[in-house]
């Protein structure tokens, strides 16, 4: 796929860039895009005059980038939003420019569906029928129900559901184990713990078995690379803002001229106009591709044998750990000398992945002959049922070629980021030591005491003693919208004898809020004071001081006030432990003083407040994962049992022998390929022939911003389908279709495009569920989780939400 100039003098890359941007501009319609930005800004300034003030805020939703916003406020209303305009805007010290989501935040602040008053449910869960109540009644009821559950069942029956709507906050942070809700519960005897995330369950679990952690080189280090290979990594949509890494990817490649290969079932926006080659692959088969590449590397003597001998365990017989079976090493597995007796040739890999044999061989030689090579993976490939094997397998490519711990190389993980470490609101120690995977909370409601350590991944004890009876849900949509199998989840939550109380604290009547027993209106982050750091932002760290843009409207309250009032009702000792006598602003001042004590280069509190944003480049230039280990493995061992890279993991071998697994589940000490349920070769494909996976969509961050009209208009919810599959079904581009399987049905327009592999379909995840749950349950909002499964992955017990089989028909 050449980037040479066409006869008219326009390169393919330039053409794709210009048409993609132009299409978005036309689709966006009412959005202010860069073409008219200065003119619009001047018009606003002229119209508002001297009565307008500018307040620094931030978008702190879970794309992770956390971009600065400059909110123009007049008469206590946000009338205009712009973004960071500080500094010289040069590479390494650039302006943190928000994407269209952050720039549309005014429409979220003033949305007609904002929650304004505390309410209690009067209909059935999910019907969305509520009546307004006073804050006193709401807080008294909440405290009484919490006391009752703890008295009857114990603190293990209380659970803080996974949520990431304000993942960037500090005082306002929603991440369950680090939220103010967790602090409150830890002051009141604790609550059932959770581990893992919906974003990274498999990779965060798997990579530490190889490296002891999950680090990768920063994207900026690509300026030292000769080759970039991206497995399912799509920063142009997942990290698309100026606070994200797309800018770094482009700028670093401008400096290195590194060739970039994108391996993905979908021709993503990261690929379009940027890549040198797109290699489409069947979902869930990346580990087979890696094995086919490894066969070529080994047989053509392209592996870095000295690196493997010095730094690794389990590559061949001489580095195999004690207790491992003969020929239990990785080299034997690849050459067909292991238990299965199958050589992982490129021909073998081609049948599984759908990639031509010749292309696998060519890719292997490119990787083996290009050093340094930046080989990375996004979080999509690991969000499969066999994702933990995929994550470890992709890491084998930099391991085999000795690209770990060097500039321009990588570990095979997703990119790491330089951040300015902030002092978080302390959540205190949780007295309850039992934990479940964050994905299995519906199981813990439905069959809690049946859940065990060896079958369900319960940690801290052999089994749960009680089911979940009280559910907190703060700034999250994972009760329904972002959790799997919505119809099954609905049935579980409908039974009020199971989970007795659900408390939702949010800004909108989300799909999850409809299931609340008590529904409390929270302030947005731009309506209260907080200090947040960057994340996923290359090698420039920054802090943003958020100040309230407007006063609190109606009866909306900040989360710290809500929980402080609950703490009062739980006892004076609980209130004192929770607040320590501080207001929200006093907590910020206290925590920031601790930061400055550790990092004197930071500006003073009042200076940061005045500046709005503070930036600092990584003093080491680029983050290089495991650099110290590479330089001196004896002085800087990894956090693995051997202190080395563990290609063969004795810990995984022990787990595989002890845990209870289904016949189609695999836990292996080696990074092997394994088929899985609802994979490309599942017999169920005779009924549901299309694989379906989700992707992060530009119009939303998960479900955040999913109710903003202009973003919905700019980026319609569609199902991607290849022209070959569409033709078989009589489907044309734009046709309304039904996507369905044994779990549910959604309806939405079809996007017929060669940008998706045949036999595969894809939908943007996070669309708001919209179905008549007392009727046909057809989801006209087209939330992908109407179609996904509750069945967790074997090792991490995490969400396999990209492993699905469906069919598509024209309506």
Annotate each language-model stretch with its function.
Residues 2-302, 328, 461, 469, ...:
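N-terminal export/assembly segments and adjacent metallocofactor-ligating motifs
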Residues 2-3, 176-263, 270, 288, ...:
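Extended redox/cofactor-interaction regions of prokaryotic respiratory oxidoreductases
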Residues 163-164, 310-313, 367, 410-421, ...:
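A glycine-rich phosphate-binding loop feature that marks nucleotide/adenosyl-phosphate handling sites
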Residues 266-370:
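Long, well-ordered, tryptophan-enriched scaffold segments
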Residues 326-445:
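Active-site phosphate/pyrophosphate-binding segments
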Residues 500-501, 548-564:
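Phosphate/diphosphate-binding loops
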Residues 526-552, 567-569, 648:
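Glycine/threonine-rich phosphate-binding loop and adjacent beta-strand/alpha-helix elements that clamp
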Residues 559-611, 703-705, 709-720, 724-811:
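Long, contiguous, secondary-structure-rich segments that constitute the structural scaffold
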């Amino acid at each position: 796929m050449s980037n040479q100039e066409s006869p008219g003098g326009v390169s393919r890359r330039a053409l794709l860039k210009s048409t993609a941007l132009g299409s978005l501009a036309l689709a966006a319609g009412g959005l202010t895009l860069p073409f008219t930005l200065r003119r619009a800004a001047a018009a606003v300034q002229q119209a508002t005059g001297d009565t307008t003030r500018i307040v620094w805020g931030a978008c702190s939703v879970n794309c992770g980038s956390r971009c600065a916003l400059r909110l123009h406020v007049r008469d206590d209303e946000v009338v205009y939003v712009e973004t960071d305009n500080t500094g010289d805007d040069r590479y390494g010290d650039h302006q943190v420019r928000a994407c269209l989501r952050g720039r549309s935040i005014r429409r979220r602040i003033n949305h007609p569906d904002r929650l304004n008053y505390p309410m209690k449910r009067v209909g059935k869960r999910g019907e969305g029928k509520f009546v307004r109540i006073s804050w006193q009644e709401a807080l008294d009821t909440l405290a009484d129900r919490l006391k009752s559950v703890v008295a009857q069942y114990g603190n293990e029956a209380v659970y803080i559901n996974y949520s990431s709507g304000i993942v960037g906050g500090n005082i306002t942070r929603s991440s369950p184990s680090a939220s103010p809700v967790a602090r409150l519960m830890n002051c009141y005897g604790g609550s059932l713990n959770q581990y893992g995330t919906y974003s990274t369950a498999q990779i965060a679990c798997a990579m530490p078995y190889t490296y002891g952690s999950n680090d990768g080189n920063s994207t900026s280090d690509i300026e030292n690379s000769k080759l970039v290979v991206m497995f399912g990594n799509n920063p142009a949509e997942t990290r698309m803002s100026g606070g994200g890494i797309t800018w770094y990817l482009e700028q670093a490649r401008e400096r290195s001229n590194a060739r970039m290969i994108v391996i993905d079932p979908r021709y993503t926006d990261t690929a379009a106009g940027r890549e040198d080659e797109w290699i489409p692959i069947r979902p869930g088969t990346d580990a087979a591709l890696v094995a086919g590449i490894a066969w070529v590397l080994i047989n053509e003597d392209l592996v870095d044998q000295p690196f493997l001998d010095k730094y690794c365990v389990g590559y061949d017989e001489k580095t195999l750990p004690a207790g491992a079976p003969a020929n239990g090493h990785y080299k034997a597995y690849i050459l067909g000398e292991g238990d299965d007796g199958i050589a992982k040739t490129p021909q073998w890999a081609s049948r599984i992945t759908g990639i031509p044999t010749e292309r696998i061989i060519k890719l292997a030689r490119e990787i083996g002959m290009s050093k340094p090579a930046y080989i990375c993976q996004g979080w999509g490939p690991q969000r499969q049922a066999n994702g933990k094997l995929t994550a470890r397998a992709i890491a084998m490519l930099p391991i085999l070629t000795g690209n770990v711990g060097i500039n321009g190389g990588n570990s095979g993980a997703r990119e790491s980021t330089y951040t300015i470490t902030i002092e978080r609101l302390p959540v205190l120690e949780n007295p309850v030591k039992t934990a479940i995977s964050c994905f299995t909370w519906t199981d813990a409601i439905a069959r809690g005491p049946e859940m065990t350590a060896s079958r369900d991944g319960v940690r801290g004890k052999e089994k749960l003693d009680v089911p979940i009876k009280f559910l907190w849900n703060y700034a999250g949509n994972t009760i329904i919208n972002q959790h799997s199998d919505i119809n099954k989840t609905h049935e579980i939550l409908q039974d009020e004898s199971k989970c007795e109380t659900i408390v939702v604290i949010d800004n909108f009547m989300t799909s999850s809020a409809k299931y609340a027993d008590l529904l409390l209106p929270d302030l947005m982050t731009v309506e209260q004071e907080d200090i947040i750091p960057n994340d996923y932002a290359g090698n420039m760290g920054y802090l943003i001081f958020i100040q309230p843009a407007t006063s609190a409207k109606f009866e909306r309250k900040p989360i710290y006030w809500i929980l402080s009032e609950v703490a009062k009702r739980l006892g004076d000792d609980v209130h004192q432990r929770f607040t320590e006598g501080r207001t929200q602003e006093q907590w910020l001042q206290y925590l920031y003083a601790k930061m400055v004590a550790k990092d004197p280069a930071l500006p003073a509190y009042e200076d940061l407040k005045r500046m709005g944003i503070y930036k600092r480049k990584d003093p080491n230039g680029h983050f290089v994962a495991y650099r110290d280990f590479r330089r001196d493995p004896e002085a800087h061992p990894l956090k693995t049992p051997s202190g080395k890279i563990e290609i063969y993991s004795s810990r995984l071998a022990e787990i595989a022998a002890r845990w209870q697994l289904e016949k189609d589940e695999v836990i292996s000490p080696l990074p092997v390929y394994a088929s899985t349920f609802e994979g490309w070769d599942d017999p169920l494909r005779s009924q549901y022939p299309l694989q379906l996976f989700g992707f992060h969509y530009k119009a939303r961050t998960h479900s955040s911003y999913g109710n903003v009209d202009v973003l919905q208009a700019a980026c319609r919810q569609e199902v991607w389908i290849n022209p070959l599959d569409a033709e078989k079904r009589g489907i044309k581009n734009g046709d309304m279709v039904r996507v369905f399987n044994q779990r549910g049905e959604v309806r939405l327009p079809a996007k017929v495009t060669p940008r998706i592999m045949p036999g595969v379909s894809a939908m943007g995840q996070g669309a708001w569920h919209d179905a008549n749950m007392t009727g046909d349950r057809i989801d006209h909002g087209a939330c992908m989780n109407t179609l996904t499964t509750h069945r967790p992955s074997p090792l991490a017990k995490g969400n396999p939400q990209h492993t699905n089989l469906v069919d598509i028909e024209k309506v």
